[in-house]
Swiss-Prot record:
The active site is at C405. GO terms for biological process: L-histidine catabolic process to glutamate and formamide; L-histidine catabolic process to glutamate and formate. It comes from Streptomyces avermitilis (strain ATCC 31267 / DSM 46492 / JCM 5070 / NBRC 14893 / NCIMB 12804 / NRRL 8165 / MA-4680). This is Urocanate hydratase. Its EC number is 4.2.1.49. The gene is hutU. It is an enzyme of class 4 (lyase). Pathway: Amino-acid degradation; L-histidine degradation into L-glutamate; N-formimidoyl-L-glutamate from L-histidine: step 2/3. The lineage of its organism: Bacteria, Bacillati, Actinomycetota, Actinomycetes, Kitasatosporales.
């Protein structure tokens, strides 16, 4: 009988499918549900509150069975975590096409989604949960690290040493925050309502210590700050209660952000509700729970604004908490900016974003070899060298060994081709799955996050992620996905992802060159179209064709 059981991706070179493209999809699906990787694997939940890899266990079993028999000229179709068909295509076509959580506009809200989910008709795919390229907390770590580095450069003379950051949320995404802060030499107080989340981050070496109380957390933080010693501190509690208290007591906080699961009100614990009662209350009275959660978020955001008024650097880290607080009636919810317009958009203009790869061999040595190859490929890229060195020393692998680093247009293709050559030569023990987060330069429409405050006002234009997905299908990606609602919740985002398998063949090399050129190229084009000078310069320098800038009237 199909049901919950431990899942772990196979390692080594023995195939259980008919080719490495299919084998890679199979292993990455299984890896998403590895207990080392997934937050709640028995429920098929990978990260992000309720982000799932498969709709139900019967669907999971059907996908595994189908991938093992899928031919080199066939494509499996996945509709919100359930395999619904196999079509004959061709060897350049993706082996899997995925559409998760997509709803027509007027129906794109949590209430309707949950009604359909209860009927067994859909699932929430988040971003990399339902697209089978989640690699654990490392997947967001460099982006979080770069964000805090940008904060340091903007306000603290290039370092967070001697500063205290206050944040909440230590789940699969938020769990990157403590290590990202300490990598920038700062001190972090990280609040979470779930004791298991705190222990998991300590176990995975993302979080240093757990405080016994708020007073203990502040004592540890001030001592470390005064010594200019990096330290991350986990604190059990509800941010909607603790932040207002800390503000009222004048806590010495320099930076404030948040990564609770505010994108889904049923995943945010209301003030006055015990954590152990949360799931039952949310299931019994979702409307009442949502109202109370939003009221609590309003208190949380009001305190964040209070810290900003007191001089702290405050930003939204893309979980929709400002929008939820506004729905609860808090008028100053958008007084502080999102992290993309504040710090990250110049990188997007260059086609930069979270490039990642996983070693299907299961051998950490394969990642070490790819790290070395990257440093040789890009000897002038100081930030890349700094990141790879720190990641090699401090990042704990979850599931299949993997690495993430931010690379731009003209870099990702070089890295992918080099990796494919390493597989072909036998330098690597098995192929690599090369993908990215959906949070990328040209693959998202999300007015509360990636496309907030676009120069031309095109925040909500959703053509771009659809074009991105189609370009990746046309370019030869191994699997391609289009999702709705990731990161910020239902009705607030459309986004696309791709994974390409470096199996050492000449065909894989051709596909990789096209995909890893065109995928980040969409980011350059999207930002040229929005009027960003940096993107125009990148397009001119690197030969990205933009028809509206060609011809006599360009």
């Amino acid at each position: 009988m199909s049901g919950p059981r431990p899942v772990r991706a196979p390692r080594g070179t023995e195939l259980s499918a008919l080719g490495w493209q299919q084998e890679a999809a199979l292993r990455m699906l299984q890896n998403n549900l590895d207990p080392e990787v997934a937050e709640h694997p028995d429920k098929l939940v990978v990260y992000g509150g309720t982000g799932k890899a498969a709709r139900d266990w019967r669907s999971f079993d059907a996908m595994v069975r189908t991938l093992r028999t899928l031919k080199q000229d066939e494509t499996m179709l996945v509709q919100s975590g359930r395999p619904v068909g196999v079509m004959q295509t061709h060897e350049w076509a993706p082996r899997v096409l995925i559409a998760n959580s997509n709803l027509v506009g007027d129906w794109a809200n949590w209430e309707e989604f949950r009604r359909l989910e209860a009927l067994g008709l859909t699932m929430y795919g988040q971003m990399t949960a339902g697209s089978w390229i989640y690699i654990g907390t490392q997947g967001i770590l460099q982006g979080t690290y770069e964000t805090f580095a940008a904060v340091a450069a903007k306000k603290f003379n290039g370092t967070l040493a001697g500063t205290i950051t206050l944040t909440a949320g230590l789940g699969g995404m938020g769990g990157a925050q403590p290590l990202a802060v300490t990598m920038n030499d700062g001190v972090a107080i990280c609040i979470d309502v779930d004791p298991r989340a705190i222990e998991r981050r300590i176990e995975h070496r993302y979080l240093d210590v757990k405080a016994d109380s708020l007073e203990h957390a502040l004592q540890l933080a001030v001592e470390a700050r005064d010594a200019r010693r990096p330290l991350s501190i986990g604190l059990l509690g509800n941010a909607a209660e603790l932040l207002p208290r800390m503000l009222a007591e004048g806590a010495p906080v320099d930076i404030v952000t948040d990564q609770t699961s505010a994108h889904d009100p049923l995943a945010y614990l209301p003030v006055g509700v015990d954590f152990d009662d949360m799931a039952a209350y949310a299931a019994k009275d979702p409307a009442g729970f949502t109202t109370r959660a939003r009221e609590s978020m309003a208190r949380h955001v009001e305190a964040m604004v209070g810290f900003m008024d007191a001089g702290a650097e405050v930003f939204d880290y893309g979980n929709s908490i400002r929008g939820e607080a506004q729905l609860a009636g808090y008028e100053r919810a958008f007084a502080f900016p999102g992290f993309v317009p504040a710090y990250i958009r110049p990188l997007f203009c260059e086609g930069k974003g979270p490039f990642r790869w996983a070693a299907l061999s299961g051998e950490a040595s394969d990642i070490a070899k790819t790290d070395k190859a990257l440093l040789e490929l890009f000897p002038e890229n100081e930030s890349l060298h700094r990141w790879i060195k720190m990641a090699g020393e401090r990042v704990h692998f979850q599931g299949l060994p993997a690495r993430i680093c931010w690379l731009g247009y003209g870099e990702r293709d070089k890295a992918g081709e080099r990796f494919n050559d390493m597989v072909a030569s036998g330098e690597l023990q098995a192929p690599l799955a090369i993908g990215r987060d959906h949070l990328d330069c040209g693959s998202v429409a999300s007015p509360y996050r990636e496309t907030e405050a676009m120069l031309d006002g095109s925040d909500a234009i959703a053509d771009w992620p659809l074009l991105n997905a189609m370009v990746n299908v046309a370019s030869g990606a191994s699997w391609v996905s289009i999702h709705h609602g990731g990161g910020v919740g239902m009705g607030r985002s459309i986004h696309a992802g791709q994974v390409s398998v470096a199996d050492g063949t000449e065909l894989a090399g051709e596909k990789i060159r096209r995909v890893l050129t065109n995928d980040p190229g969409m980011g350059v084009i999207r930002h040229v179209d929005a009027g960003y000078d940096i993107a125009e310069s990148v397009a001119d320098e690197r030969g990205v064709r933009v028809p509206m800038r060609e011809g006599d009237d360009a």
